[in-house]
């Protein structure tokens, strides 16, 4: 039986659009040969071409991850890093590629005759790096070897595809291929990034905090393009992960079915994936840190950059996205995309696209989070929809994440009302995005939070002094005893035998205990442990936490324990920190599932819980 609580609630949504990144204003040559999206007058929304994936993602023969030519030693180190990441081994010493940086921050180059027609574009891409870092690109001369202490140089040529070697890898010529399809400013900037030592951004081990990789949509045999490295094998210099990095894959690279292979956890940021317009602020900061640019340029007398900005090679402030001004003093939270972010906790409510029922604006990105009490579910009903039509909803769309709000959801567009959406937990995320052209009326929807009355809490007591009772064997090495006092009341008693933790497992029987790996010592990094507790048909699982300690974060996105009460209903919390339910949790059916996930840093003691089979 469901008890639907209807309370008055209405959320008025204000107009919001995604702010363009701001920062140092430079004369950056813009890409002119990229395909333009046709206007509504010529296409009526039916023939538009989706945003193309970066050309550097198209696989070149012999290249790793599409466009990186690695030496045998580099490939061995990368494969070791990937194997270490998969096996959860401790990090190796960071060796990538400090010895392969360009000495004195000078990179000699030649443009071969085959690329003479692209020389202006290539020079513009090098200028872009020079304008924002302390790196200098110099035409190769006979004096370079004596000045720099090596004979290495990069050579641009018209090869087969878009690719580059990584770092200073050879003692003489080091080629960068700018093939016929690669004549784009951003693509050349990307390949130069590899030459100075950058790997792809999505290879970082902390990527799962920012993006989801959808291997189910990846072409068979191309999965290695999405492998992660260990921290010991990347050079991040404490620069935050950046979905807008010019070194990041786009959203549809290596797709087998036209669906995304990468999405951002924050759906408002999906449009930043694969940008090849210019270096991002994080790209610039990373280059300046690994080449120690601030040690070369004396900016000690320059005014301090505000709001996380930093000095470039010319002592100008480079500002984070949404900040501007000489010192990054302008903008900020009032113009950030988060302004179009709404959270609903009332039992009923209404959500609409910005400006509804008038047309929404171009380049809109909004998120609506709905959260109910633990154990509840959410039903979302669309009342009106008029959104630009495209088969896969790649232009404008409303997306509903009804299972895992950090994963990909189902997209809707056009004029057909979607079916009622029902969440599997107490959380649902709805996002709305639009592209740079063609707008419509948008959408209107209402939601109701539903309380499941079948989730009840029975009363139990834990005792540490075991009486003389019958001993039952459980699936783990600890021993528990069950004493029956009368048909309606049972007392669960636990021996003093320490519980032995595990990374997942299946637990059956009348009662037992589960614990995280190494408990009560700290668990390891990079874990995913699945625990299944199952009792006889017709009975329920009752779970009581005895101790709990996981890395704390507001949304539990780093380390977490997720509990599924069965029958598609999830307890609506990713538990973390030191707080846990004081009452017992009872499954909907005869099965309960726990999922422990940890990231690549910061540990805690984990958890231990007792379970038993009960009758309701």
Swiss-Prot record:
GO terms for molecular function: metalloendopeptidase activity; zinc ion binding. Residues 17-93 form a propeptide. Zn(2+) binds at residues 190, 194, 200. It comes from the Eukaryota. SMART domains: CUB, ZnMc. It is an enzyme of class 3 (hydrolase). Coiled coil: none annotated. Disulfide bonds join 134-293, 162-182, 299-317, 319-328, 340-366, 393-413, 503-529, 556-576. Its cofactor is Zn(2+). Gene3D superfamilies: Collagenase (Catalytic Domain) (3.40.390.10), Spermadhesin, CUB domain (2.60.120.290). This is Protein SpAN. It comes from Strongylocentrotus purpuratus. The lineage of its organism: Eukaryota, Metazoa, Echinodermata, Eleutherozoa, Echinozoa. The gene is SPAN.
